[in-house]
């Protein structure tokens, strides 16, 4: 829950108002100066229109260097960030030959599989030699290798479902699967903070879409009751099917889904449950099986389980796990399965090897150690940030921890200063978040050592003081006083 301080809200609104006013003034003078110039686009409607275009030109370009920074190494605990410069006020960014070695607090490398691994990497290289980088075909033609079949069986066993289906891209897994599951005459009830892939999938399905308050099962029940009572628009016939969509860990909030309560509501009103575990599978739970394991939920109670291989497994692609009937149905009608090139064989092998490490089937206990390490690292880092006075969103055990920035001027200030001190962080602003709720999103990895985390905390604390984002310093001062008293005693 975001606790936006009143003064911070006012200063943030004032800052955006100032940027908007100066941007409009610059646009006014530009129109005057360009009035006499000829244009070869006369008569064409402008491609970019509205406030989105204005935001891009007058706000985003000012801080463009804080986003999309190229890297020149594997996204391990430390990586090389390519230095860039601009000679035209950030309109164009040029790469240099220089790199800066930085602590990586931005990648989704939760279990550390993104870098070279003693078990995974040799097998990936061998699969590259045997199968090449691409199948150059779709699954229903010549793109179905035995690796794909093995991974589908392994994923189903890992998450506790009868069957699974693979996709070459995590985003497409949601945006293509949802329209294949529900269409006209159906009802989708979605959490208000669900990922954009879910939003686009729901919009493209043709189903009626309703939203419930973030992570609020009570409001979910209200929406369900209201929609069931009213039925379909205009005809008021009963809904053909109802699907409730939630995430395991919300990627911009770091919060765990209230899954047991959501399932109880869905069972009560005979609605299907769709769980997106992109950020939770492999990252939470004693054996890495996601929020179901962490919260004590039987996977059989979740109708459709979605996940990606881009976070905990160091690869690409995604999966859907469900009953055999649902998976067979998807294999026959889902365009992303029928028409898209199958997942790259080396990427498939990477996931197979990573899951075997997690399960201990590589003959070691490295998987268990990684899971214990990510949990310990996440809880330590979150606790220390809160003690320092930062406003940190999310729950314990979650490796995603947003630090609230709010003010637009603090987005580039925080990002650039952290980079200058060799700590790479991800800053997130509109449209990925609401306009007033800009944040820095920290992602913790099992590959981070305690020394790495302390280094990151020291830099973030210094930059936080410099930028002024310790919005709850009283808590920090109280904690410091208690610790000082304990030491004296």
Swiss-Prot record:
InterPro entries: Aminotrans_II_pyridoxalP_BS (IPR001917), Aminotransferase_I/II_large (IPR004839), AON_synthase_class-II (IPR050087), PyrdxlP-dep_Trfase (IPR015424), PyrdxlP-dep_Trfase_major (IPR015421), PyrdxlP-dep_Trfase_small (IPR015422)
Subcellular location: Endoplasmic reticulum membrane
GO cellular component, one term: serine palmitoyltransferase complex
GO molecular function terms listed in the Swiss-Prot or TrEMBL record: pyridoxal phosphate binding; serine C-palmitoyltransferase activity
Involved pathway(s): Lipid metabolism; sphingolipid metabolism
Keywords: Acyltransferase, Endoplasmic reticulum, Lipid metabolism, Membrane, Pyridoxal phosphate, Sphingolipid metabolism, Transferase, Transmembrane, Transmembrane helix
Principal location: endoplasmic reticulum
Disulfide bonds: none
The protein's Enzyme Commission number: 2.3.1.50
Positions of modified residues (N6-(pyridoxal phosphate)lysine): 311
One Pfam family named in its UniProt record: Aminotran_1_2
Catalytic reaction annotation: L-serine + hexadecanoyl-CoA + H(+) = 3-oxosphinganine + CO2 + CoA
Keyword tRNA-binding: no
TM stretches of this protein: 4-24
One Gene Ontology biological process: sphingosine biosynthetic process
Cofactor: pyridoxal 5'-phosphate
Membrane topology: Single-pass membrane protein
Alphabetized CDD domains for the sequence: KBL_like
Subunit structure: Heterodimer with LCB1. Component of the serine palmitoyltransferase (SPT) complex, composed of LCB1 and LCB2.
Homology family: Belongs to the class-II pyridoxal-phosphate-dependent aminotransferase family.
Task of the protein: Serine palmitoyltransferase (SPT). The heterodimer formed with LCB1 constitutes the catalytic core.
Protein name: Long chain base biosynthesis protein 2d
Organism in which the protein naturally occurs: Oryza sativa subsp. japonica (Rice)
Lineage: Eukaryota, Viridiplantae, Streptophyta, Embryophyta, Tracheophyta
């Amino acid at each position: 829950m975001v606790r936006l301080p009143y003064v911070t809200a006012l200063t943030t609104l004032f800052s955006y108002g100032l940027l908007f006013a100066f941007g409009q003034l610059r646009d006014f003078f530009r129109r005057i100066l360009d009035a006499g110039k000829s244009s070869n686009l006369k008569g064409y409607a402008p491609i970019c229109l509205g406030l989105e275009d204005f935001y891009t030109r007058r706000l985003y370009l000012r801080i463009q260097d804080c986003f999309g920074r190229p890297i020149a190494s594997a996204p391990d605990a430390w990586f090389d960030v390519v230095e860039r410069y601009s000679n035209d006020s950030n309109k164009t960014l040029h790469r240099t030959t220089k790199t800066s070695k930085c602590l990586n607090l931005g990648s989704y490398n939760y279990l550390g599989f993104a870098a070279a691994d003693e078990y995974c990497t040799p097998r990936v290289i061998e699969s590259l030699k045997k199968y090449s980088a691409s199948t150059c075909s779709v699954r229903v033609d010549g793109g179905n290798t035995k690796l794909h079949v093995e991974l589908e069986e392994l994923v189903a066993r890992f998450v506790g479902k009868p069957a699974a289906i693979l996709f070459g891209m995590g985003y497409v897994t949601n945006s293509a699967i949802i329209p294949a599951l529900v269409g006209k005459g159906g009802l989708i009830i979605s959490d208000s903070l669900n990922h954009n892939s879910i939003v686009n999938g729901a919009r493209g399905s043709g189903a009626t879409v309703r939203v419930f308050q973030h992570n609020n099962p009570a409001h979910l029940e209200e929406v369900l009751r209201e929609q069931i009572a009213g039925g379909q628009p205009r005809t008021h016939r009963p809904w053909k099917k109802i699907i409730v969509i939630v995430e395991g860990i919300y990627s911009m909030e770091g919060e765990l889904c209230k899954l047991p309560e959501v399932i109880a509501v869905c069972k009560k009103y005979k609605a299907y449950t769709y769980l997106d575990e992109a950020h939770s599978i492999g990252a939470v739970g004693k054996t890495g099986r996601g929020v179901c394991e962490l919260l004590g939920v039987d996977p059989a109670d979740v109708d459709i389980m979605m996940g990606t291989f881009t976070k905990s497994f160091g690869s690409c692609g995604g999966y859907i796990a469900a009953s055999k009937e649902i998976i067979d149905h998807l294999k026959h009608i889902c365009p992303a399965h029928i028409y898209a090139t199958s997942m790259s064989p080396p990427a498939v092998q990477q996931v197979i090897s990573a899951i075997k490490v997690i399960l201990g089937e590589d003959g070691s206990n490295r998987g268990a150690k990684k899971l214990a390490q990510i949990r310990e690292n996440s809880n330590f880092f979150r606790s220390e940030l809160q003690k320092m006075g930062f406003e940190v969103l999310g729950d314990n055990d979650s490796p995603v921890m947003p630090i609230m920035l709010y003010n637009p001027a603090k987005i580039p200030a925080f990002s650039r200063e952290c980079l200058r001190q060799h700590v790479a962080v991800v800053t997130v602003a509109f449209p990925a978040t609401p306009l007033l709720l800009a944040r820095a999103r920290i992602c913790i990895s099992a590959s981070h050592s305690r020394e790495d985390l302390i280094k990151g905390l020291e830099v973030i604390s210094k930059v936080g003081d410099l930028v002024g984002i310790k919005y709850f310093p009283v808590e920090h001062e109280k904690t410091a006083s208690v610790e000082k008293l304990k030491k004296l005693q």
